[in-house]
Regions:
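Generic detector of short alpha-helix boundary/capping microenvironments
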Residues: 2, 42-43, 147
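N-terminal targeting sequences that direct proteins away from the cytosol to non-cytosolic compartments
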Residues: 14-81, 92-105, 109-110, 115-122, ...
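Sec-dependent bacterial lipoprotein signal peptides
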Residues: 1-16
């Protein structure tokens, strides 16, 4: 005869399986191989190295108006759903220079609502007359990386990295790290003509 304790153990062990939800997963990202090529736009006073896997798109509208310069363009990386929006301005005087710098800071600070931290990284390359600031924006901001570069007398270039997706810092972190290297390469290789 089977002991009653053993039978009660068997009945207790046969309870229904309680499913546990699987952790949320994100699609696998295939990163392109890091290759850079020279970029020089006719009529623009600068050159730099752009990713070889990017598509350079001339910007055609600015808030439903014509763009202010032929040197406004986007560096699009379709495989990562990312764009670096670049705007070039000629400096016509000290007041204009101050206005452009203030605008760059204002544009970066607009992300303070969602940002948890904004790091300002100074850029000084005196040999190439390139100076500026890179804004590394942490948190769920729409643009996580922005910059401006200038020679402080004639040329001013502003750029901002955007992803065509909802800002999710944790899931975007690897792609953001990949794209930051491309922005840094642009900043490191920019030369005024």
């Amino acid at each position: 005869m089977i002991p009653i304790g053993f039978l009660s153990f068997l009945f207790a062990a046969c309870e229904d399986y309680v499913p546990v939800p699987k952790p949320r997963a994100f699609p696998r990202v295939i990163y392109p191989e890091k290759v850079y090529q020279p970029f020089k736009q006719t009529g623009c006073n600068f050159s730099f190295e752009a990713p070889g896997y990017a598509v350079i798109e001339r910007d055609s509208t600015f808030f439903e108006e014509q763009v202010r310069s032929d040197c406004w363009f986007n560096i699009a990386v379709p495989s990562l759903n990312a764009k670096i929006h670049c705007s070039y301005y000629p400096i016509t005087g000290r007041a204009r220079f101050d206005e452009l710098v203030q605008d760059a800071f204002t544009m970066a600070q607009k992300h303070n609502i969602k940002a948890s931290f904004i790091e300002e990284i100074p850029i000084h390359r005196p040999a190439d007359h390139v100076h500026g600031i890179v804004f590394a924006i942490e948190g769920a901001a729409a643009s996580s990386y922005q910059f401006f570069l200038t020679d402080s007398t004639e040329n001013f270039l502003r750029g901002a990295l955007y992803f065509n997706t909802q800002a999710r810092p944790d899931s975007l972190a690897p792609v953001l790290a990949f794209m930051r290297k491309d922005v840094n390469r642009l900043v490191e290789t920019l030369k005024w003509e």
